[in-house]
Amino acid sequence: MSKYTQEQIKNLVEGNLDWNTVLKMLSMPKDHERFQMYLKVLQDKVDFDDKIVLPLGPHLFVVQDPQKKWVVKCSCGHAFCAPEENWKLHANIYVRDTAEKMEEVYPKLLASDTNWQVYREYICPDCGILLDVEAPTPWYPVIHDFEPDIETFYKDWLGIQPPERH
């Protein structure tokens, strides 16, 4: 089992490691402290004090607020909803549903036919960062990516108690 320092984990998160080191870190069995070090690196990158419980994306986290409630929160501090809800329904949504809008991101002949596929861009209402993009058919409902079982992840995978929740 490989052991890594807090600095190495920080460099991994920031993309400052060479590919061979990254490959080794990803493929080798993880040391027991790795997830806690990872959370510390993420916590140091945000300006809010709420404890990060689980990252959902580069700028999206499940956090424990001061009342011990778990909330989905953007890296800027904007709170969306409980982790059981679909946070996307609380985001600003920009839909690329015309040829003109698609051609802003793809050349004309490479863009999707918007009768068959649209892009939905989910944006934080406070800071404007792009949090996710979907490419469904136009009539398809907003996709709820997943609902993490945080308690099981902590207890069965990490072997530790999850943060308190009310």
Model feature map: region roles:
Residues M1-Y119, I129-H166:
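N-terminal pre-domain and mature-chain start segments
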